[in-house]
């Protein structure tokens, strides 16, 4: 308990809500207590949209986006999960810029405040400038996100405290696992702004879908069209497995269903 109180005395490093979530998590073993949201409530229609996206495969989502928009909206092979997981949610974006050797105690406070403004069905999307060997997040931030009901996090940069994040079951995709810190090396550069994460443009409110195949980003104005097409693709592909086994021919199955 003393280490939490000492940590809390550092000016603005963590909010009361975040500290409460951390203390509750440790007091009750690994149980994460959900904090009251300060973000606008997710509508029932939006919640249902996210539920439906959780049920489709990222491969189908990626194909559907490309057919509808003509754009590649999937992240590269470097974006890897810390454990096998599947999630979807609305992008909550944060950007960090390099500021080597800064002694400003407020340099990263905006990053923490941005976390405390998220809620259920949020996906934390962070772009860390040249950040493959810098941990953009770790166990404390992951605990706060879990307490607030975030679906997961996608970090164009490193992640640390991986054993703890696995223990609490909070899913994170990142481009590396490293023990480093962003403190004194980086500065908060904005939240809820358009950014590029692992080569993919992401705007606040876009839908981020992740599974064992990787991460795809659905532009919010194309969400319903992409979902409908991805559902059709999933149905065809799942139907094809039995046909291929029965006929022992992928050529015949592709000809029948028109899906590859």
Predicted regions: what they are:
Residues 36-106, 236, 242-250, 255-256:
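Intrinsically disordered, low-complexity regions enriched in acidic/Ser/Thr/Pro/Gln residues
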């Amino acid at each position: 308990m003393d280490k939490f109180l000492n940590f809390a005395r550092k000016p603005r490093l963590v909010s009361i809500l975040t500290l409460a979530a951390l203390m509750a998590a440790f007091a009750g073993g690994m149980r994460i207590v959900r904090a009251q949201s300060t973000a606008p409530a997710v509508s029932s229609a939006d919640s249902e949209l996210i539920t439906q996206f959780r049920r489709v495969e990222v491969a189908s989502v990626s194909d559907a986006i490309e057919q509808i928009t003509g754009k590649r909206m999937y992240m590269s092979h470097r974006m890897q999960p810390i454990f096998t997981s599947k999630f979807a949610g609305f992008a909550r974006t944060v950007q960090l810029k390099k500021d080597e050797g800064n002694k400003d105690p407020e340099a990263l406070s905006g990053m923490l405040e941005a976390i405390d403004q998220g809620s259920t069905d949020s996906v934390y999307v962070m772009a860390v400038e040249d950040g493959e060997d810098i941990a953009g997040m770790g166990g404390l931030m992951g605990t706060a996100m879990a307490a607030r009901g975030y679906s997961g996090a996608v970090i164009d940069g490193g992640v640390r405290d991986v054993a703890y994040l696995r223990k609490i079951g909070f899913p994170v995709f990142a481009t590396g696992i490293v023990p480093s810190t962003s403190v004194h090396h980086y500065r908060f550069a904005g939240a809820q702004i358009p950014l590029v994460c692992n080569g993919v443009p992401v705007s606040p409110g876009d839908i981020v879908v992740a599974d064992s195949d990787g991460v795809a980003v659905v532009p919010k104005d194309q969400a319903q069209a992409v979902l409908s097409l991805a559902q059709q693709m999933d149905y065809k592909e799942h139907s094809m497995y039995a046909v291929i086994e029965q006929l022992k021919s992928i050529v015949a199955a592709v000809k029948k269903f028109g899906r590859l």
